[in-house]
Amino acid sequence: MAVLLSGQYSLPVSREVVYAALNDPDVLRECIPGCEELEVRSDGIFAAVVRLELGPLKTRFRGKVRLEDLDPPNSYRISGEGDGGIAGFAKGGAALKLVPDDEGGTLLSYEAEANINGKIAQLGQRLITSTSKKIADRFFESLTNRLQPNPRTAESQ
């Protein structure tokens, strides 16, 4: 089953800060919903374990993620695959673009596709797509909160 997602998010910091955060394993580990492990294996390649709940199905996916077509601080492509054991297998990728906005922040846009099989695919397109969108929204909400300028820091300077 193929799943397509796209979205835009406004972040309150520069592209350079957003790009650096999106390449920082500590930031990613903190912001990815259900992320239990995220380790750098080599330049641009991460190994991950993510706990996922899709409707009645709960599983852990173990997989690899690769950052490709790096164009700092403008864009990159992320691709990966994960094995959820009896729950199924997922493989996909996303293109991310970072554009400065008029207020000194960044407009992040993405287009993602994933191919899913196994028990997860049997849950249906609507549930998988809506859950995937919620996971993306939670990730970007966490990222925004993490990158939010701290008013106390600005006042104390």
Task: Show the residue positions of the predicted features.
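Hydrophobic ligand-binding cavity/cleft-lining segments
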Residues: M1-I45, V49-E53, E103, A154-Q157
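Intrinsic-disorder/low-complexity, polar/charged segments enriched in Ser/Thr/Lys/Arg/Asp/Glu/Gln
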Residues: A2-Q8, I45-A47, R60-R62, S75, ...
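Hydrophobic/aromatic beta-strand elements that line small-molecule binding cavities or substrate pockets
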Residues: G7-Y9, C35-E36, G63-D69, G92-P100
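Solvent-exposed residues in well-ordered beta-strands and their adjoining turns
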Residues: S10-S14, R51-G55, E68-L70, E81, ...
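Glycine-rich, flexible loop/turn motifs
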Residues: L28, G34, E53, L57, ...
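Glycine-rich portal/gate segments that line the openings of hydrophobic small-molecule binding cavities
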Residues: E39-G82, R138
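Beta-strand/loop substructures that line and gate deep hydrophobic ligand-binding cavities in soluble
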Residues: G82-T131
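A conserved amphipathic terminal alpha-helix motif
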Residues: K119-S156
